[in-house]
Amino acid sequence: MEEQQKELDGKWLQEGVQRMMVMLESDSRNESFARVCVASFMTRMNPTVAETDDVKTAVSEAVTNSIVHGYPYEKGLIRLVCAIEKDTLTVQIRDWGRGIENVKKAMEPMYSQSVRGPERSGM
């Protein structure tokens, strides 16, 4: 946790920036919770239904990716940070799970280093 705190120091309390942080266990049941948290936080921006749906989809995909690929064998932590500055929403999803061995190769179409088989691949 000390590493995580160092990442946030100096960035958290900035004038004119509203922030939210949630720590989640890497459990698939938390994917929907993360979506709802972000959707609730962004209501202060008065988004359209389509904008809210787009953000919820992106959060769902990112959290699911952290759960499936970051922690395939064990539970771990996922940090969700949201910030609103002026009219911009920033969402950061971070895990400390298994990394990507070859980032360059991972950018290739249909590449997967999945331990669960070929049913999932990056597009």
What is each model feature region?
Residues 1-21, 66-123:
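Conserved beta-strand-loop-beta-strand hairpin that lines the nucleotide-binding pocket
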Residues 21-32:
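STAS-typified acidic loop motif
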Residues 28-30, 53, 106, 117:
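A generic structural micro-environment signature
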Residues 58-68:
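Polybasic, low-complexity association/targeting segments
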